[in-house]
A protein has these predicted regions:
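Domain-core detector
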Residues: 1-200, 208-227
Length: 227
């Protein structure tokens, strides 16, 4: 039986010792940086899970215990970085709002446990796609709830989804499903309706957003235009 506490301890040590992740956590200034952090932190978690859990023999109940605890730890690390990004974003926009944090979704963790225990074979890539998808979903949820909240108080938002040729896309044909969701929106509801926050397992698309008091975002300047 896998020791959940041991998994969490080792994962925590891996996070502390990883120079690149520490730098990303400290210097992240955009949700794209948060995306990179979530992706790499999830990769570390997969390495630890591989050390202590055998997908071929783990029971559903044990898998639930492992994934709920591991995903919650990952969620905590990712939301800390996202909250920093959001606070900096509000500070630069000159508004005194607090960053909102989505609740931990234990149902997703249980869903991964179900998929793992039901699968006839679980490859390393398959596991990584599931775990990374969950981690990137936390970043997406941070963007979703904060962009909606910003818009609700009269601020202007600019949401971007960029296609990224990684994960299941790597070495394969262009993913039409993701291409249909790529774009830029100046309205949260339009981005939501366009599927900007949706992912499939292995999806590496990058979602970012900006907030400001003016109504037009300049990609060239990387700043809001004065009006």
């Amino acid at each position: 039986m896998a020791d959940v506490n041991q998994i969490l301890r080792v994962y925590g040590k891996h996070l502390q010792k990883n120079v690149r992740l520490k730098a990303l956590a400290e210097k992240a200034w955009s949700y794209e940086d948060a995306h990179k952090f979530a992706d790499e932190a999830a990769g570390l978690l997969c390495d630890v899970l591989k050390m202590y859990m055998d997908p071929a023999t783990v029971t559903y109940d044990d898998a639930v215990r492992i994934f709920e605890a591991a995903m919650q730890k990952n969620y905590s690390e990712v939301t800390k970085v996202c909250a920093k990004v959001q606070r900096d974003m509000y500070r630069k926009a000159g508004v005194g709002l607090n960053a909102l944090t989505p609740e931990f979704n234990a149902e997703k963790a249980r869903g991964i446990a179900q998929v793992i225990t039901d699968a006839e074979e679980v490859t390393d890539d398959y596991m990584r796609n599931l775990v990374k998808n969950n981690a990137l979903g936390v970043v997406d949820d941070m963007i979703r709830i904060n962009s909606e909240a910003s818009e609700n108080v009269g601020l202007y938002v600019h949401i971007v989804r960029k296609y990224d040729d990684v994960g299941l896309h790597n070495g394969k044909d262009v993913c039409q499903w993701c291409m249909e969701r790529e774009g830029e929106w100046d309205n949260y509801q339009e981005a939501l309706a366009a599927g900007a926050f949706e992912r499939h397992p292995g999806c590496g698309c990058v979602i970012d957003y900006h907030v400001g008091k003016t109504h037009t975002w300049s990609n060239t300047k990387g700043a809001w235009n004065d009006v």
